[in-house]
Amino acid sequence: MTELPTADQIADASRTLGLAASAAELHGGLCGWLAGGGAELPAWPAAVLADASLAAPRPGDALDRLREATTAQLNDRDFGFDLVLADAGAPLPERADALFDWCRGFLGGFGLAAGAAP
């Protein structure tokens, strides 16, 4: 199975594209988008962040690897799924903020993918 890029790698790639979302929020949004029935798109940030002007990640960069690894993990019948959050050794407020960001991203991505469908 493809390994998830680190939160720092995702944040660096995110800044390169000019995205304001945290690594946790991007991963949550991608997971929500895919769980809600959204297509697995190379240009996923534009769909997940509802901004058609966003460029697609370059093939092989951290955001592209995030898409590939997340898709593989969600399809894993052995439930090999990990969240992109703050390190376990990070202070509790930082970890809580990352979990909040992930959940906010998931709900947004799921809502965008599901649209009006229940």
Task: Report residues per predicted region.
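Domain-length accessory/inserted modules outside core catalytic folds
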Residues: 1-103, 107-118
